Curated annotation (Swiss-Prot):
Pathway: Carbohydrate metabolism; pentose and glucuronate interconversion. It comes from Haemophilus influenzae (strain 86-028NP). The keyword Transferase does not apply. It comes from the Bacteria. This is Mannonate dehydratase. Its cofactor is Fe(2+); Mn(2+). GO terms for molecular function: ferrous iron binding; manganese ion binding; mannonate dehydratase activity. The gene is uxuA. Coiled coil: none annotated. HAMAP family: UxuA (MF_00106).
Length: 394
């Protein structure tokens, strides 16, 4: 696999030099300064690409070309944003970039309630606390009909949790959930956030699928024409939240996805940390079944807690994910492609490392501190080498 690393551009506290020293060769990045929906010009793409190459690295994957909210709701200028998206793909292809990761999550990107959950060893991780999230929905946001999403026991627990919160706790939880995360343009006040949610109140999962299908049928033929692989990222967490439709969460969703738009350019980002939150997702089976459509891998593990809807991000080779067999399946697919003359390795990045060691004293992007990902990348490098020696390079 190609060892890659997410970089948030020139303002990222982790420099390109740091990344090269970590052993990565590919950069996963985006033009975060360009507003969602606007065309990425060839000039801007080349400028970023040159910056990366001057550091001895290559721009391996775009993550992400954001999908404008009006595309997701099919309102306003959605056709304009789709046409802009097509032009961005053409421009990326002209600059030699061949893989684009994106998501179709409504309103929010990945969602956590705690961005600095302290583990027993003193390192810090991202965490999603189901009851804390319920307290936010029911008593802070006060989302209409939110009680329908929770049973009586959960509602009582959420009330108890909320009653113990200080004003500072409320502010911090709200900020964690709605203020936006690295790489995301959106950041909302509570009122603005509810307004965004209201735009989806009449969009069922079935209707939302028709919106995704329309987007795929517009975009994927262009990607196929210009030689770009589109790699959709799953919902994170992979279940409905905030009354929003979530439609990239299960193996059944993956099957619908490839049947809806069967062109080879239409593929997946295998994010083990997102899919792996659900105990009913068999990650090895998912990887094997859709191996020929996996164009990018986010390798990360999560640990479900006593409440199975609560989880925290585990060390990369620990937790609930069968990382050994997932990586083995990815390597099996990579060797199949190589035997058919495809030289493009599957780009892989260590996702969401723990904040640890010297990074505990630094300001870092949540989940994207250097040392935790350095550790994860080294572990995956070792796992890959061992798998190759035992199973592939006999």
């Amino acid at each position: 696999m190609e060892q890659a690393w997410r970089w948030y551009g020139p303002k990222d506290p982790v420099s390109l030099s740091d990344i090269r020293q970590a052993g990565a060769t590919g950069i996963v990045t985006a033009l975060h300064h360009i507003p969602n929906g606007e065309v990425w010009s060839i000039e801007e793409i080349k400028k970023r690409k040159t910056e990366i190459e001057n550091a001895g690295l290559s721009w391996s994957v775009v993550e992400s070309v954001p999908v404008h909210e009006e595309i997701k709701t099919q309102t306003g200028n959605y056709q304009k944003w789709i046409n802009n998206y097509k032009q961005t793909l053409r421009n990326l292809a002209q600059c030699g970039i061949d893989t684009v990761c994106y998501n179709f999550m409504p309103v929010l990107d990945w969602t956590r309630t705690d961005l600095a959950y302290e583990l027993p060893d003193g390192s810090k991780a991202l965490r999603f606390d189901h009851i804390a999230f319920a307290a936010f929905e029911l008593h802070i946001l006060k989302r209409p009909d939110a009680e329908k999403a929770y049973n009586q026991e959960e509602q009582v627990a959420a009330r108890t949790y909320y009653d113990k919160m200080s004003e500072q706790d409320i502010t911090q939880l709200t900020r964690n959930i709605i203020a936006g995360l690295p790489g995301a343009e959106e950041g909302y006040t509570l009122d603005e956030f509810q307004t965004q949610l209201d735009r989806y109140k009449d969009i069922s999962p079935e209707k939302f699928r028709t919106h995704l299908a329309y987007f795929l049928n517009e975009i994927v033929p262009v990607a196929q024409e210009v030689g770009i692989k589109m790699a959709i990222h799953p919902d994170d967490p992979p279940r409905p939240i905030l009354g929003l439709p979530r439609i990239v969460s299960t193996i059944e969703d993956m099957q619908w996805f490839v049947e809806t738009q069967p062109l080879p350019a239409n593929g997946f980002t295998m994010c083990t940390g997102s899919y792996g939150v659900r105990s009913d997702n068999d990650l090895v089976k998912m990887t094997e079944q859709f191996a020929d459509r996996i164009y990018f891998a986010h390798l990360r593990s999560t640990q479900r807690e006593d409440n199975p809807l609560t989880f925290h991000e585990a060390a990369h080779l620990e937790g609930d994910v069968d990382m050994f067999n997932v990586v083995k399946a990815l390597l099996n697919e990579e060797y199949r492609r190589l035997n058919q003359g495809e030289t493009r390795l599957i780009p892989m990045r260590p996702d969401h490392g723990h904040q640890m060691l010297d990074d505990l004293r630094k300001k870092t992007n949540p989940g994207y501190s250097a040392i935790g990902r350095l550790k994860g990348l080294a572990e995956f490098r070792g796992l890959e080498m061992a798998l190759k020696k035992v199973y592939f390079n006999k």
